[in-house]
């Protein structure tokens, strides 16, 4: 095989509890993630330069070292493959939005490299390689919806919610995950309760799965990073408030932000909300939940 094309779907966090920083520098998390129809497009082709991963992104500049180059390097280390590859990425998922664009791209590339070079890695090895690239990457290998636990390496599949439509609002801010977690640690060190929702006992995959199965209007999900991100970027709270006022039955910030999303029950509700919010926000996109 000389080339292939792939899609890398974004995700939203319905829920994100963040625990203390671990010895390895990561924080323990308990999250409910679901993939959505917003996606980047990747085209892979063989390159006659051994050990080279050439990344081209026509609409968004990428740093020289990124999740794609890291994924390629780790793939080569594990498989012994040294053939070069050219990757063309059409970015639709905003960077710094909490929608997992970089991780989704890395997961798609790993699957694509495995196919392109015929290495037939086992699911376990592929997950291990993915986790070494980034804590969110394993989720994007196969899951449509899952409880994500530990440092991101533990996945408990969920039956995807497909009965809702989504509206994304991105305020145009790059919210770095490292900064968000550092801000959360500082708030906690000062004794600030970081998320009102943390009073609820939504802990563990069993409790999260049962809660996720309910109607979204009954969800008590929360995001531990709400307080630190919204203190730094108040416009994120405004965007979420706008979604609620536009009739969303559930709203949340995804990951470490800065994108927020709302869930709607039918096309007409979604159409009205999109028409209203597109006048206020330059990036406002309708999506479906993948199932």
Swiss-Prot record:
UniProt KW keywords: ATP-binding, Isoprene biosynthesis, Kinase, Nucleotide-binding, Transferase
Keyword ATP-binding annotated: yes
Pathway this chain belongs to: Isoprenoid biosynthesis; isopentenyl diphosphate biosynthesis via DXP pathway; isopentenyl diphosphate from 1-deoxy-D-xylulose 5-phosphate: step 3/6
EC number in record: 2.7.1.148
An annotated GO BP: isopentenyl diphosphate biosynthetic process, methylerythritol 4-phosphate pathway
One annotated GO molecular function: 4-(cytidine 5'-diphospho)-2-C-methyl-D-erythritol kinase activity
Residue positions of the active site: 11, 136
Domain of life, per lineage: Bacteria
Family matches, as InterPro entries: GHMP_kinase_C_dom, GHMP_kinase_C_sf, GHMP_kinase_N_dom, IspE, Ribosomal_Su5_D2-typ_SF, Ribsml_uS5_D2-typ_fold_subgr
Residues reported to bind ATP: 94-104
UniProt keyword annotation of Membrane present: no
Catalysed reactions, semicolon-separated: 4-CDP-2-C-methyl-D-erythritol + ATP = 4-CDP-2-C-methyl-D-erythritol 2-phosphate + ADP + H(+)
Similarity remark: Belongs to the GHMP kinase family. IspE subfamily.
Function: Catalyzes the phosphorylation of the position 2 hydroxy group of 4-diphosphocytidyl-2C-methyl-D-erythritol.
PANTHER family per the UniProt record, alphabetical: 4-DIPHOSPHOCYTIDYL-2-C-METHYL-D-ERYTHRITOL KINASE, CHLOROPLASTIC
Official protein name in the record: 4-diphosphocytidyl-2-C-methyl-D-erythritol kinase
The organism of origin for this protein: Treponema pallidum (strain Nichols)
Lineage of the species this protein comes from: Bacteria, Pseudomonadati, Spirochaetota, Spirochaetia, Spirochaetales
